[in-house]
């Protein structure tokens, strides 16, 4: 879930590889 990927995901998806939209709306490395 952390650290953050420097990307937001209001649409529910992250473009950064290896990152998930959790906690919404912040992309974090899973």
From Swiss-Prot:
- SUPFAM superfamilies noted in UniProt: Cyclotides (SSF57038)
Tissue/organ expression: Expressed in leaves but not in petals, petioles, roots and runners (at protein level).
Leader sequence segment: none
The cysteines joined by S-S bonds are 5-19, 9-21, 14-27
Provide this UniProt record's keywords sorted from A to Z. Answer: Cytolysis, Disulfide bond, Hemolysis, Knottin, Plant defense
Please describe the post-translational modifications of this protein.
Answer: This is a cyclic peptide.
- Pfam families given in the database record: Cyclotide
InterPro entries the record matches: Cyclotide, Cyclotide_moebius_CS, Cyclotide_sf
PROSITE patterns, sorted: CYCLOTIDE, CYCLOTIDE_MOEBIUS
Q: For this entry, list what GO says about its biological process.
A: defense response; killing of cells of another organism
Using the UniProt entry, state the residues involved in the cross-link Cyclopeptide (Gly-Asn), renumbered to this chain.
1-30
Q: What is the recorded function of this protein according to its Swiss-Prot or TrEMBL entry?
A: Probably participates in a plant defense mechanism. Has hemolytic activity.
Q: What is known of its domains?
A: The presence of a 'disulfide through disulfide knot' structurally defines this protein as a knottin.
- Report the family membership: Belongs to the cyclotide family. Moebius subfamily.
Protein name as catalogued: Cycloviolacin-O24
Q: Which organism is it from?
A: Viola odorata
What taxonomic ancestry is recorded? Eukaryota, Viridiplantae, Streptophyta, Embryophyta, Tracheophyta
């Amino acid at each position: 879930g952390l650290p953050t990927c420097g990307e937001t995901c209001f649409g529910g998806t992250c473009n950064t590889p290896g990152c998930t939209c959790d906690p919404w709306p912040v992309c974090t490395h899973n």
